[in-house]
Swiss-Prot record:
InterPro entries: Ribosomal_uL4, Ribosomal_uL4-like, Ribosomal_uL4_dom_sf
Superkingdom, taxonomy of origin: Bacteria
The keyword Zinc is assigned to this record: no
Subunit and interaction comment: Part of the 50S ribosomal subunit.
Single GO term (MF): structural constituent of ribosome
Name under which the protein is recorded: Large ribosomal subunit protein uL4
Organism encoding this protein: Ureaplasma urealyticum serovar 10 (strain ATCC 33699 / Western)
Annotated family: Belongs to the universal ribosomal protein uL4 family.
Function recorded in the entry: One of the primary rRNA binding proteins, this protein initially binds near the 5'-end of the 23S rRNA. It is important during the early stages of 50S assembly. It makes multiple contacts with different domains of the 23S rRNA in the assembled 50S subunit and ribosome.
C-alpha cells in the first residue's frame, strides 16, 4: 500500500490515504512510457499536409531551350523537381494516418510507471472526497494552490465526474491543468511538476486496474 497526503479544498493537509499498490510498479518501464507518449503525439497529427508533384505544378509546358548547341544541360520542363518552383518527388499527400498501435497492457504499464515516478519523487498529492466547490471561484483555487505551496509549478489536477465547479474555477489558471480521471494520459502525468488526484479518482483507478 502507498500512502498519499490528502489536502482539503483550502490547500491544507487533511489526512493520509492508503492507495492499493496495484496502481504502481516496482520499476518504471521507460520503453512503455516512450511508446505511449509517441503514440499520443502521433495521433494528434492531422495528416493534411500536401505538396505538388511535377504533373500538378502550373506552367512549364514549353521546353525552356532547344535540345542541342546551347552549352547548357538538356531539359524539357521547368516543372522538373530540380528546378526552383518545380514539383516535389515523393512529397507528402493528405489523408495519411499517423496512428501507432500500443497494446492495452503496454498502455496500462506506462500509466502505472508514470504514477510510480510521481509517487517516488514526492510529487503526488490527493484531494479529499466531496471537495467540489459550491460555485465556481477562481480565487478559492488560487488560495488552494498557494496554501499547498504549489505556486510557479505546473499542476495536473485529476478530478471525478461531479467536480464541475473546480473545473470551471481553474480555466483561467495558466499553470493548472484539470482533467477528468479517465482523460489523463501518460504525457499529462510526465508534463506536470505536481499531480493532485481526487480521492474519488483513486477509487476509480483502483477499480479499473482490478478488472
Amino acid at each position: 500500500m502507498a500512502k498519499i497526503k490528502l489536502l482539503s479544498i483550502d490547500g491544507n493537509f487533511a489526512k493520509e490515504l492508503e492507495v492499493t499498490s496495484d496502481l504502481f510498479v516496482e520499476v518504471p518501464h521507460k520503453q512503455a512510457m516512450f511508446d505511449s507518449v509517441l503514440a499520443e503525439n502521433a495521433a494528434e497529427r492531422q495528416g493534411t499536409h500536401s505538396t505538388l508533384t511535377k504533373g500538378e505544378v502550373r506552367g512549364g509546358g514549353k521546353k525552356p531551350w532547344r535540345q542541342k548547341h546551347t552549352g547548357k544541360a538538356r531539359t524539357g520542363s521547368t516543372r522538373n523537381p530540380h528546378w526552383t518552383g518545380g514539383g516535389v518527388v515523393f512529397g507528402p499527400k493528405p489523408n495519411r494516418n499517423y496512428n501507432l498501435k500500443v497494446n492495452a497492457k503496454v498502455r496500462l504499464l506506462a500509466f502505472k510507471s508514470a504514477l510510480t515516478i510521481k509517487l517516488n519523487e514526492g510529487k503526488m498529492l490527493g484531494l479529499v472526497a466531496n471537495s467540489d466547490l459550491e460555485t465556481p471561484s477562481t480565487k478559492k483555487m488560487v488560495n488552494f494552490i498557494n496554501n499547498a505551496n504549489l505556486e510557479n509549478q505546473k499542476v495536473l489536477l485529476v478530478i471525478a465526474d461531479h467536480f464541475s465547479n473546480i473545473k470551471k474555477s481553474t480555466n483561467n489558471l495558466q499553470k493548472v491543468t484539470t482533467k477528468l480521471w479517465y482523460q489523463v494520459s501518460v504525457r499529462d502525468l510526465m508534463h506536470a511538476n505536481v499531480v493532485v488526484v481526487a480521492e474519488e479518482a483513486f477509487t476509480n483507478y483502483a477499480r479499473k486496474v482490478s478488472k
